[in-house]
């Protein structure tokens, strides 16, 4: 399974700011969008192009455009919403599918409560966005949904990934490409990534954070 840890200086700098224990909701939200945009740049570098002609200021000119590639962005609720605006800033015409998953805090198993996929999913490149790839359960479940609906090309954009989550995706969906700002050390006994970012959903929405 291809996994790309994007070690661009801007990403490393912004991720370092996000790791601060005292970061404000506003700052975390803005940085999540910015890193999401930078990951989108990396995840779309190989999209095919085609030539076409336009009328320029000095006459006809040949330019390029993305070759008819339909894209859907798939935020995993609720934390994935924190990255969505950053992704759409670069691909504003992309359709948005929504998947809602909640994790049982004892078993760490993900349960689906929302599944709203756009039409023609079988013809689209799906970009799943979720700040944390921890156990990998939510990501694997989302990929399952997309494949069941006919989606054939899936990429995942995450801020931080744990080795445990990567291994699960390698076993269950080796054809999915992952783009991450960092591969961290491990999960703790509660399923939180170490050193991680804390609870990304709580930090995006400003709700009370659970102890890790």
From Swiss-Prot:
EC number(s) per entry: 2.4.2.9
UniProt xrefs under InterPro entries: PRibTrfase_dom, PRTase-like, Upp_B, UPRTase/APRTase, Ura_phspho_trans
MF annotations from Gene Ontology: GTP binding; magnesium ion binding; uracil phosphoribosyltransferase activity
Binding site for 5-phospho-alpha-D-ribose 1-diphosphate: 78, 103, 130-138, 199
Cofactor binding note: Binds 1 Mg(2+) ion per subunit. The magnesium is bound as Mg-PRPP.
Catalysis: reaction(s): UMP + diphosphate = 5-phospho-alpha-D-ribose 1-diphosphate + uracil
GO biological process: UMP salvage; uracil salvage
Major enzyme class: transferase
Record's keyword terms, sorted: Allosteric enzyme, Glycosyltransferase, GTP-binding, Magnesium, Nucleotide-binding, Transferase
Pathway: Pyrimidine metabolism; UMP biosynthesis via salvage pathway; UMP from uracil: step 1/1
A Pfam entry, by short name: UPRTase
Residues annotated as binding uracil: 193, 198-200
CDD domains per UniProt: PRTases_typeI
Regulation acting on activity, per entry: Allosterically activated by GTP.
Cofactor list: Mg(2+)
Family: Belongs to the UPRTase family.
Primary role: Catalyzes the conversion of uracil and 5-phospho-alpha-D-ribose 1-diphosphate (PRPP) to UMP and diphosphate.
PANTHER family assigned to the protein according to its UniProt record, in alphabetical order: ADENINE PHOSPHORIBOSYLTRANSFERASE, URACIL PHOSPHORIBOSYLTRANSFERASE, CHLOROPLASTIC
Name listed for the protein in its UniProt record: Uracil phosphoribosyltransferase
Source organism (scientific name): Azotobacter vinelandii (strain DJ / ATCC BAA-1303)
Lineage: Bacteria, Pseudomonadati, Pseudomonadota, Gammaproteobacteria, Pseudomonadales
Gene: upp
């Amino acid at each position: 399974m291809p996994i790309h840890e994007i070690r661009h200086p801007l990403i490393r700098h912004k991720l370092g700011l996000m790791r601060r224990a005292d970061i404000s909701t506003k700052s975390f939200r803005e940085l999540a969008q910015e890193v999401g945009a930078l990951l989108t740049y990396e995840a779309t570098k190989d999209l095919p192009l085609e030539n076409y002609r336009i009328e320029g200021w000095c006459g006809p000119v040949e330019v390029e455009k993305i070759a008819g590639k339909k894209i859907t962005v798939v935020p995993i609720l609720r934390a994935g919403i924190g990255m969505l605006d950053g992704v759409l800033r670069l691909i504003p015409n992309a359709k948005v599918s929504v998947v809602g998953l909640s994790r049982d805090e004892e078993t760490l198993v993900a349960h689906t409560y929302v599944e709203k996929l756009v039409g023609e999913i079988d013809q689209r490149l799906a970009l799943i966005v979720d700040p944390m790839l921890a156990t990998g359960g939510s990501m694997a479940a989302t990929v399952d949904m997309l494949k069941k609906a006919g989606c054939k090309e899936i990429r995942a954009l995450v801020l931080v990934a744990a080795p445990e989550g990567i291994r699960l995706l390698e076993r269950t969906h080796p054809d999915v490409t992952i783009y991450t700002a960092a591969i961290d050390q491990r999960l703790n006994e509660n399923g939180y990534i170490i050193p991680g970012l804390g609870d990304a959903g709580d930090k995006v929405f400003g709700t009370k954070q659970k102890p890790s």
